[in-house]
Amino acid sequence: MHSTFSTDSKVSPEILLDTAIKRGLKSITITDHMDCEWPADPTQYIFDEKEYFDKLGRLREEYKDRIELNIGMEFGFRNEEDVVDKIDKRWAELKVLPFDFIIGSTHLYDHGDPYYPDFWEGHQAYRRLMEFYEATLFNVEHYDGYDICGHLDYAARYVPKDVHIEPTRFLNIIEVILKKIIESGRGLEINTKNLNKGFSMPNPNPMILKMYRAMGGEIITVGSDAHRAEFVGGCFDKAREILLDCGFKYYTVFKARKPEFFEL
């Protein structure tokens, strides 16, 4: 989940914690965004890791008798040649900090975000989505030191509504991505953001989750991707059903960068 330390969230860490307590959660992990070189104006958003740890560290102590707070980060990996060196430098600075949990995500490709319509304009949607998976493959091979790959099929969320692309067309490259993730000892998340918005499937698609499990993948975290309080812990019951159907018996929580497994 994301707080005001993320450029796209307006909810304070305190509100996230209070909401989680009201909903009966015993533990949460705040994973604010660090997308280097994005937005394009570097003065618009700068992730201040010292302020982040100071704030969440105080809240962890303040709330310790009511809920466990783990401190995480979602780092945005990129493959564009003109920014890779900058990303590498920032990643090297952040990955060694005492986070409990680090999500490595691909949000951006070709200096654009699939969330925005202009990412797709002037491009053949299938080719664009394939290029995004190719960028994701580069990222999971190039970067190390993260715990799980976030919302693996992120770009598929935002394919234009008038376009239908069969997910099975991407299974070959997805299999290669999953193989790299498993071989490196990392995992996946099931991201319930789409479920919270009324869609029938999470990210990644259950087809991908089943493939991951069949290939021997075991590390699976559950994230709401909440940017607003109303989505804290949203659709975790549905996520449990999906994971069980995909063959999982346990979900994972990271503490001090170590995975702990809990029965679903």
PLM regions with names:
Residues M1-H2, S9, P13, G24, ...:
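Charged catalytic cores and adjacent phosphate/nucleic-acid-binding surfaces used
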Residues M1, I28-I30, L69-M73, I102-G104, ...:
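Hydrophobic faces of well-ordered beta-strands that scaffold small-molecule active sites
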Residues L17, I21, K95, V140-H142, ...:
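Non-catalytic positions within long, well-ordered alpha-helices that form the structural scaffold/packing
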Residues A20, A40, A92, A125, ...:
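A sequence-composition feature that detects small, non-aromatic residues
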